[in-house]
Amino acid sequence: MEQKRLHFIDAIRAWAILMMLQGHFIDGLLAPQFRDQDQDWFQIWTYFRGITAPVFFTASGLIFTYLLLKNTHTTYVNKRIKKGLKRGVQLIVLGYLLRLNLQGLLNGHIYPSFFYVDVLHCIGLAILILIFAYKLIGYWSIKGFSIVVFALATLIFSFEPWFKGLDWSNWPVALSHYFTRENGALFTFIPWVGYSFYGAFMAVILVKLSHKKMFYPIAIIGLFILGTWLKYDSSRFFIFL
């Protein structure tokens, strides 16, 4: 039976897109004299601009995985997997096409910025990895799938400082962009895909528990407490790790 659509997922997706658009728009047009960190309004805007990318990545993993798991019928699952494979490849290709300088290409030159890795590349790769993890584990055990994606996300964030210190100079530049920002990439595969994996873990919880009577009040309160701790008192914990 088709499950009821969760409209708040659409709201999260819409919020992330709108925040991304306004963030780029204001950042591109705001004069330097108005970028005053002592102003409350600018601090608020900076904070929300800072969480836009994590929300966008988390929502992408949550939405894709929720749609994949909400119906266990084989025909539906295979359809979602095929669509996900297509979408993941499309996002990666589109990420490169958006960085392609047409005039330079007509002149027989491809600029280095063409190989920069951005949001679309990372989300596309995250979707492909989630599909692989589902086919490998989730098809047989949703619980096992949730453990794997949660563990992957946690490992990614735990070892990100060590990973950042690795030397990628011997790698082809086009590949190194996925792992380091030293050559100009804006987003890297690590740690950003970790947010998508946490989103996938949240999707499993939604699929399994969203029908429970007290799920949403408990989830909202729990996420509020977790978010407050992450914002104000998580630094010491991660430094300890």
Which residue stretches match the model-derived regions?
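Alpha-helical transmembrane segments and their immediate juxtamembrane cytosolic regions
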Residues: 1-241
